[in-house]
């Protein structure tokens, strides 16, 4: 449905709604994950375009959760708890090599740049990195410690789904785009129903720890 993709690109949330996460210190000695971030929560419905409301409602369907179960070989009764967020990255922003939290089953990254606002040569690809089973998840390898096993594509209405394991290292090298351009992705995270996720739900938070009743984020 290229026409729906085009509409979603046109209707992406305004960067003014996003929280800056540039230069934040990370655990285990890992370099920062530089981005502007907007966490989906129900309060956002009032400011999202109809195209995005419809897309998110579709992603919350049982059909999409069943897609996750089929892709990762889960049973039909395995709980799949979804969280979603937009990330925009300006020139120079990067995501250092890391694995995701154990509560995550995996991530599905949708890329929302077009040839009108992005070039593949500027970067932004999600890199799949092989550590040869040598690096513990709570560590900070650099690119020279890892082998690049694959990379996503940014343009062409692409998405990229991967499972979380103790060795599912991935990263994004510093994007090299002109000023005023942004790498734009929307990420759906599938989470396990862990004690942490249950406790967060009891406290009115989503699986990522954001308050479900929170208002629209603004800088």
Model-found features: residue ranges?
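Non-heme Fe(II)/2-oxoglutarate
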Residues: 1-70
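Amphipathic alpha-helical surface "interface" segments used
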Residues: 27-34, 89-90, 206-213
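Catalytic core of non-heme Fe(II) oxygenases with the double-stranded beta-helix
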Residues: 41-60, 65-201
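Short, cationic low-complexity segments
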Residues: 133-137, 203-219
């Amino acid at each position: 449905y290229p026409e729906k993709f085009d509409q979603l690109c046109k209707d992406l949330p305004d960067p003014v709604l996003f929280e800056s996460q540039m230069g934040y210190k990370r655990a285990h000695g890992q370099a920062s994950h530089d981005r502007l971030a907007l966490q989906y929560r129900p309060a956002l419905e009032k400011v999202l375009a109809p195209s995005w409301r419809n897309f998110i409602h579709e992603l919350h369907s049982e059909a999409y959760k069943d897609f996750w179960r089929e892709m990762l070989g889960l049973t039909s009764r395995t709980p799949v708890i979804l969280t979603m967020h937009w990330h925009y990255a300006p020139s120079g922003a990067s995501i250092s090599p890391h694995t995701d939290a154990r509560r995550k089953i995996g991530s599905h990254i949708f890329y929302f740049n077009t040839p009108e606002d992005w070039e593949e040569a500027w970067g932004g690809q999600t890199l799949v990195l092989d550590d040869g089973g040598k690096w513990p998840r709570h560590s900070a390898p650099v690119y020279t410690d890892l082998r690049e096993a694959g990379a996503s594509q940014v343009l062409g209405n692409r998405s990229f789904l991967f499972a979380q394991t103790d060795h599912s290292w991935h990263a994004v090298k510093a994007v090299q785009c002109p000023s005023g351009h942004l790498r734009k992705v929307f990420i759906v995270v599938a989470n396990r129903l862990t004690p942490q996720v249950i406790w967060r739900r009891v406290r009115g938070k989503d699986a990522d720890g954001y308050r479900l009743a929170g208002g629209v984020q603004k800088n």
